[in-house]
Design a protein with these regions (language model features):
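Conserved HGGG/HGGXW glycine-rich cap/lid loop of the alpha/beta-hydrolase fold
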Residues: 6-67
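Conserved acidic catalytic loop of the alpha/beta-hydrolase fold
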Residues: 72-90
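Gly/Ala-rich beta-loop-alpha elbow adjacent to hydrolase catalytic centers
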Residues: 94, 98, 102
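Flexible "cap/lid" loop of the alpha/beta hydrolase fold
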Residues: 103, 107, 115-152, 156
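Conserved alpha/beta-hydrolase catalytic His-Asp/Glu region
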Residues: 132-137, 151-213
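Short beta-strand/loop motif that positions the catalytic acidic residue
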Residues: 217, 223-225
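Conserved alpha/beta-hydrolase "acid-adjacent" motif
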Residues: 230-235
């Protein structure tokens, strides 16, 4: 089995297919490297596609309590993966927790020029728990969930978190696909999921506190969200307004795991975006078209 070892000694399992420009997929809290199979099969025809399982997600290592499960560590793991595979630059695609990882990678390596290691960013379903009105509650809920997972196991996670409001659209449209997703969720390491929920989910900073840093990102950025993924709607608009090289795609009648729920739409939007990036399209919005405020008409909610 192929692994890359991070600079703090954690082995990350990865799979790859295809040749060409590297295209790296970063999974959500309820997923793992297998979550990207519909994308790997499609994009491996023209890209070097790589999907990996984050620390805490088998077959990657599950570091014990006291180890580093943090937002900072997660984007560093992505960098270690690239270093281990001798990848200087790549297109980065992340869903939810993976979207946060790609965004934070972009904060350090998302400025065009010789220092940029991100050719583009795709941030899908990114922003749950970020709005100031729900931020503290989300952090508290993440820690409660961590305790429940550690006590009751991953099957409990599948029976509760896997049945959340933004998952029901997937279940209704594609019962077989949803059943596969939920069965895989029940296979997760309870310890790894608990530590991720407590450390990464429960301690990550709000996007609303990072707008000045996010505004420095100037690589092409695709923001995607389902229009029924309520926790991600406002944060997606915030990202669109803040990153001046961003475009926004909203998938109708769709929930959170849009790459699995609507793989054809997801792949179509991503393929068109990547084609424009590789053709040298200028994604920078003219100053005259930019919003007066990144907060929208309701004003700063902080």
């Amino acid at each position: 089995m192929p692994f890359v070892t991070t600079d703090d000694g954690v082995r990350l399992y990865y799979e790859e297919a295809g040749t060409g420009t590297p295209l790296i997929f970063v999974h959500e809290f309820a997923g793992d490297h297998r979550s990207w199979e519909p994308q790997i099969r499609f994009f491996a025809r023209r890209y070097r596609c790589i999907a990996y399982s984050a620390r805490g997600y088998t077959p990657s290592d599950v570091p014990p309590p006291g180890s580093d499960y943090s937002q900072e560590r997660v984007w560093q793991d992505l960098r270690c993966l690239m270093d281990g595979l001798n990848i200087a630059q790549a297109h980065l695609v992340g869903l939810s927790m993976g979207g946060f990882a790609c965004l934070h990678f972009g904060l350090h390596h998302g400025t065009q020029g010789t220092a940029s290691r991100a050719l583009s960013l795709t941030l899908a379903g990114c922003g749950t728990g970020s709005h100031p009105a729900v931020y503290e509650g989300f952090k508290a809920q993440s820690k409660v969930l961590a305790d429940e997972i550690q006590t009751l196991g991953a099957q409990h996670l599948a029976n509760t978190y896997g049945m959340g409001p933004s998952r029901l659209q997937f279940k209704a449209k594609d019962p077989r696909g949803y059943a596969e997703f939920n069965a895989r969720l029940a296979e997760h390491s309870a310890l790894g999921s608990a530590l991720t929920s407590r450390g990464y989910q429960g301690e990550r900073p709000s996007l609303y506190a990072l707008t000045e840093q996010i505004a420095h990102i100037n690589v092409p950025t695709l923001i995607m969200t389902g229009d029924e993924d309520e926790p991600c709607l406002e944060p997606s608009l915030l990202l669109k307004r803040t990153i001046h090289t961003a475009v926004l795609a909203m998938l109708p009648g769709s929930g959170h795991a849009i790459n699995l729920e609507e793989p054809q739409w997801f792949n179509q939007f991503l393929a068109e975006f990547l084609a424009q990036v590789e053709q040298g399209h200028d994604f920078a919005r003219p100053v005259a078209t930019r919003p007066e405020s990144i907060w929208g008409p309701s004003g700063d909610p902080r």
